[in-house]
Each structure stands twice: as structure tokens, then as C-alpha cells.
Amino acid sequence: MWSLLLLAALVGQGFALKNVFDMRIQCPHSVNFGETSVSGYTELPPLSLQEAEQLVPESSCNMDNHQSLSTINKLTKVIWRKKANQESANQNSFEVVESEVSFKGLCMLKHRMVEESYRNRRSVIYYDLAGNSTFCKPTVYMIVPIHACNMMKSCLIGLGPYRIQVVYERTYCTTGILTEGKCFVPDKAVVSALKRGMYAIASIETICFFIHQKWNKYKIVTAITSAMGSKCNNTDTKVQGYYICIIGGNSAPVYAPAGEDFRAMEVFSGIITSPHGEDHDLPGEEIATYHISGQIEAKIPHTVSSKNLRLAAFAGIPSYSSTSILAASEDGRFIFSPGLFPNLNQSVCDNNALPLIWRGLIDLTGYYEAVHPCNVFCVLSGPGASCEAFSEGGIFNITSPMCLVSKQNRFRAAEQQISFVCQRVDMDIIVYCNGQKKTILTKTLVIGQCIYTITSLFSLLPGVAHSIAIELCVPGFHGWATAALLITFCFGWVLIPACTLAILLVLKFFANILHTSNQENRFKAILRKIKEEFEKRKGSMVCEICKYECETLKELKAHNLSCVQGECPYCFTHCEPTETAIQAHYKVCQATHRFREDLKKTVTPQNIGPGCYRTLNLFRYKSRCYILTMWTLLLIIESILWAASAAEIPLVPLWTDNAHGVGSVPMHTDLELDFSLPSSSKYTYKRHLTNPVNDQQSVSLHIEIESQGIGADVHHLGHWYDARLNLKTSFHCYGACTKYQYPWHTAKCHFEKDYEYENSWACNPPDCPGVGTGCTACGLYLDQLKPVGTAFKIISVRYSRKVCVQFGEEHLCKTIDMNDCFVTRHAKICIIGTVSKFSQGDTLLFLGPMEGGGIIFKHWCTSTCHFGDPRDVMGPKDKPFICPEFPGQFRKKCNFATTPVCEYDGNIISGYKKVLATIDSFQSFNTSNIHFTDERIEWRDPDGMLRDHINIVISKDIDFENLAENPCKVGLQAANIEGAWGSGVGFTLTCQVSLTECPTFLTSIKACDMAICYGAESVTLSRGQNTVKITGKGGHSGSSFKCCHGKECSSTGLQASAPHLDKVNGISELENEKVYDDGAPECGVTCWFKKSGEWVMGIINGNWVVLIVLCVLLLFSLILLSILCPVRKHKKS
């Protein structure tokens, strides 16, 4: 083992990439009772015959390999060669050579080896060889106890130059076998096979190994002749033993033949009818050529005198195992025949053999493991959210359009746990898990992070900080209103004068600007008038020397005196008496405004009253009376705003918060409702119908419409298979095409085109000089069959809803279909039409558990199906296997001195692979609450993709005299509450509701505090005690949630927890979609004051320390006010 690890560490990267292969072993996440083992295998590239004979398997796995595999096993090696003295090809132109060869680790299992390896916690590693005359392809097999799944994640196996990485993959199956995306548990009882209608049928891959053991109980040839009805003699002296099988890579050993085990019977039947099993072709070897030399007999072992085994010699790519055991000897004569097909046909009595290893599909009866719902939790982590999904029975599918779902799964006890990260929390997180749509409301995560941050900042008083934080962190306007209310109460006596002073300073600044601007405008108007008068009477005010326009007469006289003498009239600086020089000086002169300022001083300003600026200066913002008035007014306004904003914004169409009670409708005319309802939504309508003549007479009306149920009568078409198409050319020089039986003749689906006696000099290999003899057989066959889905054809489809009406004391229910009505004495409820994507004749294909939804096929092949069509390879229930047709044309391609090659111009891609490539072009659908049999499927649509047109008419002709009194009496008691107030997830209130005076009563129970109601549940009460759970969203820290019926509520209420940093549970969309309408009034001003009072009382009763802390802060602000703004002292006159 250490040499293997050292070699693996020293090899280069390129070598490792070229010679490392994967072997994947699927493990369920629970350990079965019994000696359950898991197995896997992998195909390896070819080696030369000499290298193959030196192979020894090695393992670095922490489970020891079974010791018996290290023993040397001897076999009879049979090869063929051309005769040296033959000039033309015929049945005598080649010969066989027998010899003894030894292998270590070849697939020659001993009696009780697998059972001992389970008890001793050892692995069984071995290999098989499929070879021709020059090279062999190894196939490595491994059987380990199921406990290895809990002990290892991966390990390394070495075989010659190759390294096999064994990867233990956890499936989401509890104990079953993963097939078609579902977990299948086979049943070994024969009675289940006889009553197939009661059980499911699945095609499971099985691997079997021949165990040679001399004992009269193991007369396998006798069992074969009995099963085939042959009349062979001397079966007692033939080989004895049995096959040990692992079903689906995960099962306890199955022993064949065994009459009491149906699984063994199916395996034994498969070995007899298709003894070669699945081929060993590597990818790219689907198209290959065989050159058949002919049939020949050999001596097994080579020391016997007579020939006792018939074989067929070939040259080309080896596709089937070269190991077998002679059937004619009870001594266990093992055979290694590279380049020869041994005769495995058991319909003849002599010269045949049995396969050492068999691999193929068998049909078994059993049941599928139930699909359990998921629980999804999320918590904030950095900038995003960290989420976990749990499911009791495993998670078969989990996706999210906005999260990074890892494929590395972990298991915790009997539940599967998958962790994933969501990068964004600015929108709700949507997760599809086990066919259910879960929504994580990230608003609650943000609330929790806010509470955590505030509590951490004020960690000296964690209780007080938490109580304040849960109010401040409510999202939206309500949180800001809470912050404003607390700040005003605690620090308003300091902040009000400070804010008022800041506002006064800003106002005085603008008032000063306005006052200065007005004075300047008045002075400019005076200058303009002076200038206009001067120009009218004496002329221009422009200096003749410097051309400067003067504003006053005094300025003009100064220019006339100074400019002529070359002086500046403003600063008396000497300059050249030219216009250019003087104008340049004016640009830098600092005294050009001298005459303007002198004039401004002589102008007497207009007397202005006190004005805005003076009024602002005189405002007494430090007055205690002013501060008290503003503090009280702000508290009242902010309390009203806080209460009005305390209602949580609803998610349409879930719930609209309203006040207590039920709306009333005066029946002047018939009451008619006409609307469209999504298929996933429930609808509740509740009103009091009042007499238009007498308002005191009323009748209670309650209508409940359940979500849409879809029921389809179907025909079970069976299982759809994926497959690989193989094209093989088989050429032999002489004889008719029917002379040889090729291994693919035993495949479930095959087709052959023969070109008999058509050889010519231009279409012959060099060793086949004959002309007009022999055969070229072009064979098509399907292998690697894998069931991928289950198909149902819709015969008829029905959309229905259950409708219940409570009219007074009258209670009636009915399930109505599309275009159907429910008519009572006073009400008529109709489904006028349904918008749907299902129609008669469609085919529903489920590529996995039916709980995960399926695909709708409008054009599903029904009769003549070609390979590549939907339904090309089908396994119908209780009917023979259906193979596709191959409509393409064959062509025999010939070249001089080469073996002919067959070409096929038809489709070579399976229908399943074509559907996967274009799956986005098909309509899909999700399912919830699905129930199914072979004849009928019923489910509900969780996405609301379908819609019903609903029409409700309530007649105005109501006998109010007799119907006004309702004898039903309802008693209410709040029993328990879970969840949090003010959060996006909400709370669940459990109510104990008692009903007396009538047997049944359809009504609604609400979850309310003193002011408004946050959720309701429509329920049919039975006489006695009833438990009702109501889900609501909203409320505040002071809300005491009660169970209410109409305006009557339970005597006591319960307070929900505060939103915190706990994990947020996902909401099932199917449970979340309901439309409730009872016409109750919205919350008004009185309701707001009730909410404010309830909040204050909640703080006092819940955590009175918070109130003390707030009062201490208020006192501190008053002291600070007296220091910063002391009271003005008035002197005595």
C-alpha cells in the first residue's frame, strides 16, 4: 500500500491525468439490516496480453483487501492462430493453442468470500479481462461493506499503470437504490411479482459473479436445463456452483438460482437469455469491426485428450468478457480466451461454458421511498445569507435562482443536510426543494441583524438595549417613527431649543440677505433717476477725455479737472492723459466707488418697521413654555404616525390588516362577485347580509373556495429508457450469414442487415482470397440501457374546487368542476371556465419523483417510433419491451485488401438525449400534494399557473324573519403562540375553539390585538372542542394576540417573540396563498390611539426597566437644558 502511495505522489501531473480514472460508489444515508454491501466498477483502456497477465490489484483504502484475492489462480488460456500451410481461407485455416496461465486478483471469487469480507470489514477488489489476440481491456470491480460509506470519502486503487479514484457518493435515498431519480426498494417475495398491480416495477442494473462450489445443492446446470426445458443427460457430473449478485450497487447478496427469491429468479433468467450481458465498449468504440475467422473447438484443460468447448475466433475490438468456466466439468475448469467468443448458449447440452461475470438489467417489483418535505432555514452571514435545507428522507433535488447550491452534501443522522450561500438579501430568497417552493423573507434577516448590532453597541444594558432595538429595527416608516418618538421623549427638552435656534439662524440669514438686497435696489433706482434728469437738462455724463460714464455730477466735475491734467479723478495717481491709459488704470484702481459711497451716505434711508429680521431676533426659543408645548405636540403627532405605520405591508394576496368585526351588505339587489382566481389560491368571503328595511335583521354569509385540484385519468405507458446505439461490422470469409450467432443477438434491441455471398476481389482482406463466399453482417444494437423517466398519457383531465357555504345555520359543501355550479336556496357559485395548459392526449413525463413535477409532451410517439423520437425505447408495465425502429439505410463500404465496413446514415442519438438538449422548448409543471396510481393522478398546482373564472350570486330574496337568529355559540381561548411580531415570517397562534348549539359551523377565526387583526383562518367547526392555528404577520412589541370571532375575542392574549437573529424558516407557497375578504373596516384614528396605548402598556408590563431608563434620560436632558439655557433672572424695579 505504501509503495502505491509513494508512486502516486511521484508521478507527474500529465501521467496522472492520463491514467487516473474514477469509480463512483453510490451509498444510501442509512445502513440496512442484513449484510448489505455496495459495489462499483470502471472500464480501463487496453493493455497488451503480456501486461495483462502480470496485473495485481493494490489498494490504499483503509479497509484491508480480502486475503484470498492474493492467491494465484490458474486458468486454461485459449488463443487462435493461422495455420502455416493454408493458402485459402476456410474453416480449417486456423487452429487453437491451449496452455495454462496464472492470474492474481482475477474475478474468481471463492465460496463465502463476500460474506466474510462483510463480517471482517474487508473490501473485495478484482478485475475482469475482455481481450483479443493482441490486447485486453481490464474492468475493475469493488465490493465493500456498506459501513465504508461512513468511514471513507475516497481512496485509491492501483492496477498496472492505472490508478482508480474510488469516490463514495451519498445519494438522497434512505436505504433504496437510486433509479430514474427515485429511490427504489426491491421486494424479494414471489407474491409481489404475482400481484404486480400492487407494486411498482423498476429496471435495476445487477452485477453477478460465479462462485464454484462442489455441493449437490449447487447443481446449476440442472437448474438451467429445468428452466429451459432441455433434455440434457449427466447434469450431475457438470459444474456446480451459484451466482452471487449485488443489485443496483447496493444490496445484500442475492444468490441465484433460488426459487424462493424473486430477485434471484429474474437474475437467473437474464443470465440464461442474455449470457454475454452488457458489452465492455469504451467511449468511442460504439462503431467497430469484427473479422470472424470461424468456429473451433478446444480442450479444457489442455491436458485432456478430447475437445470439450466450442468457440468462435475473431479479430477486432474486444467487447465482451474473455473469462468463463467450463460447464461440462464439476472440477471448476476456468477459461481465459482472448480473441474467442466461448459458446455460452445453454440450449445445447455439450461444449458450452458459463460466464464468470454477468452485468445487465433486470425488472424487479418493489416500492419507492416516500418523498419528504424540506425545511429550509437561513441566517445572515456577511453581505449575504447562509442557508441550510433538511429533509427526513433525503433531498432529491434542490435549486435556487439566486443562491449558490453546492453539490457536496452532508448527512446528519437520518436527515440530509445541504448548506448553501445566497449572495443577495435585497430580495426574498426562493428555493425549490423536493418539489416544493420555499420562500425565505429576507426582511426578517435584516431585522435580526439590526437588533444584534444595536444590542452589541449598548451591551452594558442588554435587556434594555434589546427591548429598544426590537422597536427601532422594524423596517419602513414605522422604525423611523419609533426612533423619532424615543428621541423626542428623552432628549426633546434639549433638542427642541437647539433645533429652533438652528432654524432661527437660517431664517435670519435669509432675512438679512433679503433686507440688504432691498436697500441696494432702492439706491440703484435713485442713481438711475439722477442720471436721467441730468441727461434731459444738461446732456451726457460721459467724460470727454477717458470716455467713462459717470453716475453723479460731482464725479463728472472731478473727471473734467483731473483727466485733462493726467491724474486719476479717484486716487489722484499720475497717468498719461489718453483714453487707453486711463481706462487701463481704472481696472486696477481701488477707489472707483468713492463718489458712489459719498452719495449713499447723503441719501436719507426710509424708515422701516420691525420686519421679519427683528421679529426673529426677538423670538424666545429658550422659553420653558414654548419647549413644553412643542414637546407635547410632537409626542402626540409622532405617536399617531407611529401607530398608523405599525401595520405590516401585506404580501398580495395574503392578507390586508383591518379592524375587528365583519363587513355588512344591505341586500337592495342581488349580490354578485365575478373574479379570476389562481389555481393555488384559496378564497374566503364573509359578510353580514342586512335587511334593507330593518338594519337590525341580518344573516351571516361565509363562502369558502378551496385551491384547485387537478385530476387526470391516465394510461401508464411505462418507463422511458436512455440507450447507446452501437454499429458493429462482422465479416467472415465463408459460410452463410445465419451460421454464426453474434453476442449482440442477445441484446434486448437489435437489428441486423446481412450482405451474403457478395465478396469480391475489391472487398476482401488479404487473408480472405475467396470470391463469392462468406458474409458481411451489419448489426445495430442498444446497450447501456438506463431508465430515465415514467410516462403517462392523459385520457381525461378535470379541474375542481371544493366550495362550502354557511348561510345562517345552513351549512352545505360541494366539489364543482369546470363549467359547473353549486346552487343552494340563496347562493349560486359557478366556475365559468379554466385557463389551462393540459389537454386530452398529452403525455406527462416525470424525470424523477413525481413530487418534483414533470414535462408536457404534445407530440409523443404512439405507434411506429424511430430511434431518437420521444418514447423510442420503452419498458411498458406488464408488457414486452418495446424497441424502436431504425429507418436509416445501410451501406457496405469496401476498399481493396481491407475488411468491409458497414455505414449507417440514420440517427444515432437517443430520444432522451435529444429532449435534454431542447428541454427549454417543452412546457413543464410543478406538483404538490400529489397522489397517483396507474390509472389516475391527482395533484395541486403550487405556482398558480392555471386560473379559474369564478362567479358568485347571492339572491336578495332572503327570509330575514326566520334566518336572522343563528343558534351556534362559539367559545375562544388562546392556547399557544409561535413566531415573532413585526417580522416577515410572522407568528402562528393556536386557538382552542368550542362549538355548542349546532353540529357544524363554517366560520373564520382571526388573530387580533386590541386594535386590528393580522390573520385569519377559515375553518369548519364541529361540536365540542376544535384546535385552530392562525398565521399572521405584523403587530408590535405590545401586541397581545387574541383569538377573535367577529367582535368577540378570547379573554386573554399571548405575546409573540421579538424578531431576532435566529434562523428564518422558509414559507411553503402552497400554504401561503389564500385570499381573505370579510369586509372589516380599516384601522382609523381611534384604532391608532388604541395601538399606541397598547404599545405603552406593553412596555410598562413587559420590561418596566426600559421606562425607567427613558425617564432617566429625560431627567438628564432637563438638567442639561438648565445648564446650557439657564432661566433669565428679572431685576426688581
From Swiss-Prot:
This is Envelopment polyprotein. One of its GO terms (molecular function) is zinc ion binding. Disulfide bonds join 27-149, 61-155, 173-183, 208-245, 232-349, 374-433, 378-387, 403-422, 450-473, 733-768, 737-775, 749-883, 763-894, 778-902, 804-813, 821-830, 861-865, 968-998, 991-1043, 1008-1013, 1044-1049, 1083-1087. Belongs to the hantavirus envelope glycoprotein family. Gene3D superfamilies: 1.10.8.1320. The keyword Transcription does not apply. GO terms for cellular component: host cell endoplasmic reticulum membrane; host cell Golgi membrane; host cell mitochondrion; host cell surface; membrane; viral envelope; virion membrane. InterPro entries: Envelope_glycoprot_Hantavirus, Gc_C_bunya, Gn-B_hanta, Hanta_Gc_N, Hanta_Gn-H, ITAM_motif_hantavir-typ.
